[in-house]
UniProtKB/Swiss-Prot annotation:
It holds the Pfam family Ribosomal_S3Ae. One of its GO terms (molecular function) is structural constituent of ribosome. Keywords: Cytoplasm, Ribonucleoprotein, Ribosomal protein. This is Small ribosomal subunit protein eS1. Belongs to the eukaryotic ribosomal protein eS1 family.
Length: 262
């Protein structure tokens, strides 16, 4: 008697079950290093696929841009409205060394500044630093009520807006063209450029909330690793301070003199 197939038996699926592999076994972590102009030097970690054959892990890291809040970089909550962009330029061991790549203010900060009854004035210009970085800087300002003003609104005239915008452009060019990029970044943090604009435009029309809204890097010079490492190494002045010698106690001097006599 011929034995046929038993149709009641369950059929197996083609291929069977696939092995579940953990994706993170093929990845590795790298530390992110910020330049010395910021207080927090290790600002995070980044993930990248491990080196497989000719495909190096470092190639996947170079050129990555990280957006970090300035409050986290300087441990100051008053600077939480600014965002800094840092670009990974060089990797040593498991450390990624970054450089400044841009700046912007948060959307909620910008929305909180715009109000009815005030004129918004914005100016921008392309500048070049001493170390051949080409930047585009955007400055923003708002009109302010004059002292003892009874009028509820404070709108500036078109001629006044043009004069203020010209002043903005001139000050931004003057401040950026005479310094290195690292010194210019130090000016962005305390808003020294915005304060200078507010001071010089006071005669045209009183201003308030003058700040650098955005900074774009249009062109960067060829990477110089020695200059990049200078940004990440502390200078000799910061390395250590002289400590005053403490006066020797009377008990110690008495013991020493007694030992010398014997």
């Amino acid at each position: 008697m011929a034995v046929g197939k038993n149709k009641r038996t369950s059929k197996g699926k083609k291929g069977g079950k696939k092995k579940v592999t953990d994706v993170f076994t093929k990845k590795e972590w790298y530390d992110l290093k910020a330049p010395k102009m910021f207080l927090v030097r290790n600002f995070g970690k980044t993930l990248v696929t491990k080196t497989i054959g000719k495909k190096l892990a470092t190639d996947g890291l170079k050129g990555r841009i990280y957006e970090v809040n300035l409050a986290d970089l300087n441990n100051d909550e008053d600077q939480a409205h600014k965002k800094i962009k840092l670009c990974c330029d060089h990797i040593i061991n498991k450390d990624c060394y970054t450089d400044f790549c841009g700046l912007s203010i948060t959307r909620d900060k910008l929305c909180s500044l715009i109000r009815k009854g005030y004129t918004l004035i914005e100016g921008y210009t392309d500048v070049k630093t001493i170390d051949n970085y080409q930047l585009r800087m955007f400055c923003i300002a708002f009109t302010k009520k004059r002292p003892n003003q009874t009028k509820t609104t404070c709108y500036a005239q078109t001629s006044q807006i043009k004069k203020i915008r010209k002043k903005m452009v001139d000050i931004m060019n003057a401040e950026a063209s005479k310094v290195l990029l690292k010194d210019l970044v130090k000016k962005f943090i305390p808003e020294s450029i915005g304060k200078e604009v507010e001071k010089q435009c006071k005669k045209i029309y009183p201003l308030q909330n003058v700040l650098i809204r955005k900074v774009k890097i249009l062109k960067r010079p060829k990477l110089d690793i020695s200059k990049l490492m200078e940004l990440h190494t502390d200078s000799k002045e910061d390395a250590g301070k002289n400590v005053k010698s403490l006066p020797e106690s009377k008990e110690a001097t008495n013991i020493l003199s007694a030992e010398l006599k014997h």
